[in-house]
Design a protein with these regions (language model features):
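Phosphate-backbone binding interfaces of nucleic-acid-interacting proteins
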Residues: 1-111
Length: 111
């Protein structure tokens, strides 16, 4: 399957900062509930992320992440996930977050 640059432009991927993280015991697979500040234009949004192997809730607070903000909300158990926090698999298939390598303003759009 191929994609064009125009396809990529349809994705609204923004920098956010995790403001709150807590275990999500109702999820089918181990996960956290996340609250992500995406700046004044978008505000704070909720997400669910299966990132429990490499991160604790305490590790996540204040961490910058990349998130897709223009997918429709998705019901995950009792949580309505509003953004998709992005990650890649490590050698064992566990999620590692994609993050800016320097602190940048929240809400910035990836291009």
């Amino acid at each position: 399957m191929s994609a064009t640059y125009d396809d990529f432009q349809k994705l609204d991927i923004r920098v956010g900062r995790i403001t709150r993280a807590e275990p999500f015991p109702e999820a089918r697979k181990p996960a956290y509930r996340l609250w992500v500040d995406l700046g004044p234009e978008i505000g704070e949004k909720k997400s669910s992320a299966q990132i429990t192997k490499h991160y604790t809730p305490e590790d996540l607070i204040g961490r910058q992440v990349l998130a897709v903000v223009n997918f429709p909300p998705r019901q995950i158990g009792p949580v309505m996930s509003e953004v998709l926090v992005l990650g890649v698999p490590d050698d064992e298939g566990e999620v590692v977050l994609i993050v800016p390598d320097k602190d940048v303003p929240v809400g910035g759009r990836m291009y």
